[in-house]
Amino acid sequence: MAIFSDLSNEFQIIDYSPTHNQILIRSLKSKNRDYNIDIIIKGVLSILIPSIFKGLEISIAEISDKKYLIEDYGFKITKDYRVFSLKDSTGKVYFLNAMCFGVYHNKLDILETSIGRYDMENFGENILWYAD
């Protein structure tokens, strides 16, 4: 079951902060909408994802995928960390090991990041927060 799904827009990695263990995946403003769609992923341990997604759907990974990722790539599953699957519109599936993620709409400039900020309530609208 998808936690987040937007298969009609292009998303790309915009920023990564190893000191904050965060990654920002953004769908930039377009002629069809005047806001970015930012996906801020926190507590990032491992990533096996491309830099650009043609559409994006985020779910919790299947049990069969988790075993392979734990054994081959050192992914961790604890009460805090989970394995997310990221699927593009072509059906290709990628994986990310992290704690949680949030989806925001904002009007930040293309070079302006939304990770590592302390003014989260001021920079955009929180659409979804997943930390279950």
Spans of features found by a protein language model:
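Surface-exposed, interaction-prone regions used to assemble/regulate multi-protein complexes
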Residues: 1-132
